[in-house]
């Protein structure tokens, strides 16, 4: 029987490829994939993430290949993402794995969401695979384990993080969350933030503690991506690692005998 995977995405602006790449990988692998968002509305990509001419101003690199932008627009304009569950409606007992996808909007409507934390804690207790990419990893940081003095569920683990050196941060930043495909009923947020909301690298370093490791390699790239497995977690650094993230989740789910280890709730 095909494994069932729950994919979470933000309604306030995904980085298109960070949803598209794992989504396509999971479906291509033949898994039964269900999408959930905070509002139960189609997840829309940030407009800059589907602009093939966009050059990241921090790393001075064009991060959106034209063929990737075209595929994201195809998914956004079509029906595959049209009718997601809400986070509250989703029940972890119905799935074999939970996969969080990134984007700057995840810092607003995912990272401190009770419903996301409940799904993650239920997956953690059941020793199911938990995936996190880029800024969605903040949701792992803030999911706390009552059995471990309310430390993060990633305490003691090796977890990737979007590097501090890549953050949009500085005196004059005014970041908006303009979406591709926005409608009157699904237009995201008009909030302005002074760059990225939080430095994820710092959050992860604090959350994993001295016995864990924050993997935050500033030279990660499409040809040399950064993804990592430390059961039950599969994590990826940022957009350049989106394809590798999806592929690694498929690899782990297809080879649980190799990767799965006892968790704190089933020892």
Residue spans of the language-model regions?
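Glycine- and acidic-residue-rich phosphate-binding/metal-coordinating active-site segment common to enzymes
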Residues: 129-130
């Amino acid at each position: 029987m095909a494994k069932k995977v729950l994919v979470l995405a933000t309604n306030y602006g995904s980085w298109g490829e960070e949803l598209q790449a794992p989504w396509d990988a999971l479906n291509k692998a033949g898994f039964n994939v269900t999408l959930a968002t905070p509002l139960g509305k189609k997840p829309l990509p940030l407009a800059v993430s589907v602009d093939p001419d966009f050059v990241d101003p921090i790393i001075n690199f064009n991060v959106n290949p034209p063929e990737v932008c075209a595929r994201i627009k195809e998914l956004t304009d079509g029906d595959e993402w049209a009718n997601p569950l809400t986070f509250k409606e989703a029940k972890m007992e119905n799935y074999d794995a939970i996969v969080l996808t990134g984007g700057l909007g995840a810092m607003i409507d995912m990272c401190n969401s009770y419903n996301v934390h409940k799904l993650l804690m239920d997956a953690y207790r059941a020793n199911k695979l938990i995936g996190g990419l880029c800024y969605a990893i903040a949701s792992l940081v803030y999911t706390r384990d009552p059995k471990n003095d309310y430390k993060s569920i990633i305490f003691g683990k090796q977890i990737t993080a979007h590097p501090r050196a890549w953050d949009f941060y500085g005196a004059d930043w005014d970041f908006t969350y303009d979406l591709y495909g926005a409608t009157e009923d699904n237009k995201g947020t008009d909030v302005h933030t002074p760059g990225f909301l939080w430095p994820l690298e710092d959050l992860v370093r604090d959350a994993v503690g001295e016995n864990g490791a924050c993997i935050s390699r500033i030279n990660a790239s499409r040809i040399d991506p950064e993804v990592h497995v430390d059961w039950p977690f599969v994590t990826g650094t940022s957009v350049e690692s989106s394809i590798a993230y999806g592929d690694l989740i498929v690899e782990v789910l297809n080879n649980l005998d190799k990767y799965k280890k006892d968790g704190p709730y089933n020892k």
